[in-house]
Amino acid sequence: MLLNFTFKNFASFRDVQQFSMEIPSKENSEQWKYPELSTVTALYGANASGKSSFLAALWFVSSFVRDGYVSGVGESEIPRRGFLLDHLSATDASEFSIEMYAEDGYRYIYEFAVTDTTVEYEELTAYYSRRPSLLYSRNL
């Protein structure tokens, strides 16, 4: 179950964007497995306001996690779309963070940053209690 999704430097978004499924504590429902989370959300806005780019960022993370990336295979490129309207951002890494509850009931945060050809860093943190446990971290 998705809690938060954050990304930066992807498609039409240069700055940090955050999407949260968390709801105010006064509105929590005890009838739901995760009472602090909304069971439904809507994404709406004017034409050309970034709705499709937001969904593309979420899809990119999903495919990156599912399919992975093999470095050093020919001229392989990571199919990310950095912000192109700023020459500095076009070459900067795109950053992503997903906070979620997994099927085991624990909360996890997975973060990574990629350029067109490399994974700059990757980190997975689990919350088996109130304290975070770093499961792995790798930097280039």
Region locations from a protein language model:
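Conserved beta-strand and immediately adjacent loop positions that scaffold enzyme active sites
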Residues: 4, 97, 121-123
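Conserved P-loop NTP-binding catalytic core
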Residues: 36, 41-42, 55-116
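Generic, ordered loop/turn and secondary-structure boundary motif
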Residues: 11-14, 22, 84, 120, ...
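A generic structural signal for short, non-catalytic loop/turn and secondary-structure boundary residues
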Residues: 12-14, 54, 91, 117, ...
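Glycine-rich loops and low-complexity Gly/Arg-rich segments
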Residues: 29-32, 42-47, 67-69, 122-125, ...
